Amino acid sequence: MEFIELLEIARRDRVDARIILLGDLFTKGPRPDLVVEAISELRAGGRRVESVCGNHDLRLMDALRKHDAGASLDELTPAEAYAIRVLDRAGKLTAARRILTETISKTYIQGAGWAVVHGGIDPQLGLAGTSDFEKIHKKAAPGRPHWWESYNGDDGLLIVGHKPLFEPMVLRRDGNPIVVNVDTGCAYGGFLTAYCIEEDRLIMVASQQPARDGFGATPVATAPRWASGGPVRTFARRP
């Protein structure tokens, strides 16, 4: 499983790593039960594992509430029904609910000079002024500029997902990263990508899902699109 492989690389490279997930935890892959297991095991071992809220986390929570109110799985949307079924059969539904409840309570996580947010921000309003809805759902309409093209770095480094790209995006200002998008389409056969803030380094593992929508090609190993001011080190690995 890609998530577990990526975690193993991150733990090997930085034994004290704080792990922050970009959301959409349980409905983007075939084994949500293994995601629960991985998070639970890391926490049991003393690791700090957190997640910001993604739009699919909200959808899953809404589906769980409907299911609790009497809706059958057949009445729910397919992705959410599948996740609930797998989690329930594996005995992981209660733990998943707990993780999901924590996740949807956080629209961003902020540190010294950086913040993690699922979708993005309104560059005119900044991180503090952007609504929770936009932080989760911010995405350019087809043919429109991405929000990060107008971002000047005033809120520091922003690490985001939500908008799948064929390659990881690192946008720089004066040589320093100001936006990193790590959504590289793992659900579509691309890559699962992480970013190490301290080392300005991308870590990537190849998806095991069928390639579609143009994903599946090996990304460049130097400066990806949108990157400027120097190369970005990447680690790509095929299963």
Give the label of every model feature segment.
Residues 5-8, 34-37, 65-68, 130-131, ...:
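Short, glycine/charged-enriched secondary-structure capping and boundary segments
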Residues 19-21, 51-52, 115, 159, ...:
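Residue-level marker for buried hydrophobic side chains located in beta-strands
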Residues 16, 28-112, 123, 132-149:
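Active-site neighborhood of divalent metal-dependent phosphoester bond hydrolases
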Residues 1-38:
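N-terminal active-site segment of His-dependent metallophosphoesterases
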Residues 1-2, 27-30, 57-61, 109, ...:
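Active-site environment of divalent metal-dependent phosphoester hydrolases
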Residues 8-12, 42-44, 107-111, 149-151, ...:
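A short acidic-Thr-Gly-centered motif at the start of a beta-strand
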Residues 24, 54-55, 118, 162, ...:
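Divalent metal-coordination and catalytic microenvironments
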Residues 138-239:
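Acidic, His/Gly-rich catalytic cores of divalent-metal-dependent hydrolytic chemistry
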